[in-house]
């Protein structure tokens, strides 16, 4: 039979490894060698062993975990005669303040523990139920699902006093709904009943009798009764607060949620900050917009934020009455109360520069010169640079290189020289000179004036026949007169009456180099 290897046990992290030395997990040298023939009482791992029976009983495992955290199970009240008969393992005169008392094992196996217990000690300290309240074997260590639900509802602001029917039937239905896991435990052979009609009134911490099908409002959470009820949650006092008074009928403006599976629904009241910094209460469920505070900034509750974020995830598109489609950018807008589109804000150090550049790019195409026609570009004469251009060390403005003797250059009508490979791509984008912005197409001025007047709302037919212009706009009349003068100048140059060309209007007497 092959012998088992020697195991090394780390006392710092409870790691087990076979190679001697420091612990490979935490690098601690507080290790101990465990041989295969080590007695169980000498095994350092015995403290971490869990009995196999505890896996079949979750309640016993939970008690073991609570005891390891320092939260012992303490019987808080004197058991009755009936309970002493049913539970022979209990002491006849238990001390409520004793810390070494052990629970009845039969209670863990059958699961019949009392529902009139306090909130878990791991959350609220060593608080115990009141002695003499008639509650048998109150165990603060047992976690009650209904108490956990009420605990989170208190934190989320969802456990305010709610209206409840005065009938005994509705009260019994509410008790069964609030504690469904323990309804069977109350009916299985328990002869002793608490004196109070509602056993949960004696639980440690805060108890708020709230129906699950009626989520409370923010208006009710501001009442003094709610503050007195929820204040002992984080205190270690053993005195339970009295239950708050129950109104006889629902107040106006409170919405009712008919689905009991979603107690954290959107509230009907929210708070808002006014212009002067004062808090105002706004009823969001009313249809009258006059009830809302003018100029108030809403402080949305968690339920409304989740409803806005996840309310339309499954919607294929924005349809009337179904909300907006899901947009990740709207998440930050709802949380931080951003007005407008988040893309309109300047985020980061270069945010403002990016917005200005985007606006300039959008406005560039409105008044930018049109590209030169291909036939005009093809008719341009390609030549060698003249000698005086070489002597003056002229350079191409586009590529910023000096002209050489063997370079192919093109002279524009404005008398400026450029490289052939530089000016042709330029003219295909911008039909003007790169130096003086003079158009290379003689007919481009007429087309630009026509397009400008069309954009301003004027009829281009008036320019074709200026004598029929009947507009009263002074600016349009001046443009017509300018166009007439330019047309007469073009006609006179074609008949030889003048040697001035239309291009001379854009060229200075001394061209720029």
UniProtKB/Swiss-Prot annotation:
PROSITE patterns: ZF_RING_2
InterPro entries cross-referenced by the UniProt entry: RING_finger_E3_ligase, Znf_RING, Znf_RING-CH, Znf_RING/FYVE/PHD
Ranges annotated as biased composition (Low complexity): 82-106, 229-238
GO molecular function, one term: zinc ion binding
Taxonomic superkingdom: Eukaryota
Gene Ontology cellular component list: cytoplasm; nucleus
Compositionally skewed regions (Pro residues) per UniProt: 239-248
Zinc finger (RING-type): 396-437
Region annotated Disordered, chain positions: 72-113, 155-262, 439-513
Keywords, alphabetical: Metal-binding, Zinc, Zinc-finger
Annotated organism of origin: Schizosaccharomyces pombe (strain 972 / ATCC 24843) (Fission yeast)
Keyword Zinc in annotation: yes
GO BP term, example: proteasome-mediated ubiquitin-dependent protein catabolic process
Protein name: Uncharacterized RING finger protein P32A8.03c
Composition bias, Polar residues: 164-189, 210-228, 253-262, 442-493
């Amino acid at each position: 039979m092959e012998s088992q290897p020697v195991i090394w046990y780390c006392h710092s992290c409870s790691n087990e490894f076979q190679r001697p030395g420091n612990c490979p997990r935490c690098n601690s040298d507080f290790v101990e060698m465990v041989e295969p023939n080590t007695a169980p009482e000498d095994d350092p791992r015995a403290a971490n062993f869990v009995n196999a029976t505890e896996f079949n009983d979750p309640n016993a495992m939970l008690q073991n975990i609570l005891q390891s955290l320092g939260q012992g199970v303490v019987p808080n009240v004197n058991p009755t005669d009936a309970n002493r008969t049913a539970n022979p393992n209990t002491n006849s005169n238990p001390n409520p303040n004793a810390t070494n008392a052990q629970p009845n094992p039969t209670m863990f196996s059958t699961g019949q523990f009392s529902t009139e217990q306090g909130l878990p000690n791991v959350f609220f300290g060593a608080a115990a139920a009141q002695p003499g309240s008639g509650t048998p074997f109150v165990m603060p260590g047992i976690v009650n699902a209904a108490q956990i639900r009420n605990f989170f509802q208190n934190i989320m602001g969802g456990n305010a006093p709610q209206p409840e029917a005065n009938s005994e039937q509705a009260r019994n239905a509410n008790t069964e709904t609030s504690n469904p896991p323990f309804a069977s435990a109350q009916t299985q052979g328990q002869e002793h009943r608490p004196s109070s009609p509602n056993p949960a009134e004696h639980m440690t911490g805060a108890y708020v009798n709230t129906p699950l099908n009626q989520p409370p409002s923010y208006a009710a959470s501001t009442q003094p009764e709610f503050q007195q009820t929820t204040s002992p949650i984080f205190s270690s006092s053993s005195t339970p607060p009295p239950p708050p008074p129950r109104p006889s009928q629902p107040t106006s403006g409170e919405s009712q949620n008919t689905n009991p599976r979603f107690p954290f629904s959107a509230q009907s009241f929210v708070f808002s900050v006014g212009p002067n910094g004062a808090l105002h209460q706004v009823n969001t469920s009313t249809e009258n917009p006059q009830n809302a505070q003018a100029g108030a900034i809403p402080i949305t509750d968690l339920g409304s934020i989740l409803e806005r974020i996840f309310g339309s995830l499954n919607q294929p598109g924005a349809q009337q009455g179904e909300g907006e489609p899901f947009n990740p950018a709207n998440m930050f807008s709802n949380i931080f109360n951003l007005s407008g589109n988040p893309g309109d804000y300047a985020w980061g150090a270069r945010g403002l520069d990016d917005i200005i550049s985007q606006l300039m790019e959008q406005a560039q195409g409105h008044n930018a010169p049109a590209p030169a026609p291909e036939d005009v570009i093809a008719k341009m004469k390609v030549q060698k640079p003249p000698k005086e251009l070489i002597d003056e060390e002229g350079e191409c403005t586009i590529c910023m290189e000096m002209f050489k003797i063997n370079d192919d250059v093109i002279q524009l009508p404005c008398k400026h020289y450029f490289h052939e490979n530089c000016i042709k791509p330029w003219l295909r984008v911008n039909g003007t000179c790169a130096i003086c912005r003079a158009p290379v197409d003689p007919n481009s001025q007429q087309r630009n004036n026509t397009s400008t007047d069309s954009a301003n709302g004027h009829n281009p037919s008036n320019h074709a026949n200026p004598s029929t212009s009947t507009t009263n706009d002074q600016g349009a009349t001046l443009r017509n007169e300018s166009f007439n003068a330019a047309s007469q100048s073009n006609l006179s140059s074609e008949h030889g009456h003048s040697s001035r060309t239309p291009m001379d209007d854009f060229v200075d007497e001394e061209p720029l180099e």
